[in-house]
Amino acid sequence: MKKKGGRKIFGFMVKEEKEENRGSVEFQVFSFTNKIRRLASHLELHKKDFSSERGLRRLLGKRRRLLAYLAKKNRVRYKKLIGQLNIREQ
């Protein structure tokens, strides 16, 4: 283990201390929502871009499944996230 500038390096892995937890359900839903909004605005301009439309549908499905998981595990966090992202409840 080498220490370099406040980071721990294990071979190929660099581990840094960060405030957000990128593996959390909330962060993943937030990330998917940003991608969904970006793709939706792209599809308004390019209506015949069917590969992007397919990607949008995949992202919608992933977000729906993550939200269903969060609603089942912790309803309070689910309601808070829905309110923050301004998306409909399922």
From Swiss-Prot:
Ribonucleoprotein listed as a keyword: yes
Phylogenetic classification of the source organism: Eukaryota, Viridiplantae, Streptophyta, Embryophyta, Tracheophyta
Q: Which organism is it from?
A: Triticum aestivum (Wheat)
The record's GO CC annotations read:
chloroplast; ribonucleoprotein complex; ribosome
Cite the SMART domains for this sequence: Ribosomal_S15 (SM01387)
Main localization is plastid
Q: Which NCBIfam families does its entry note? A: S15_bact
Keywords of the record, alphabetical order, are:
Chloroplast, Plastid, Ribonucleoprotein, Ribosomal protein
- Summarize subunit and interaction data from the UniProt record for this chain: Part of the 30S ribosomal subunit.
Under InterPro entries, the record lists: Ribosomal_uS15, Ribosomal_uS15_bac-type, uS15_NS1_RNA-bd_sf
Q: Which family does it belong to?
A: Belongs to the universal ribosomal protein uS15 family.
Give GO terms: molecular function aspect only.
structural constituent of ribosome
Gene3D superfamilies attached to this UniProt entry: S15/NS1, RNA-binding
Instruction: Name it.
Output: Small ribosomal subunit protein uS15c
Offer one Pfam family short name for this entry.
Ribosomal_S15
Asked whether the keyword Secreted is assigned, the reply is no
Q: Where in the cell is it found?
A: Plastid, Chloroplast
Q: Name one GO biological process term.
A: translation
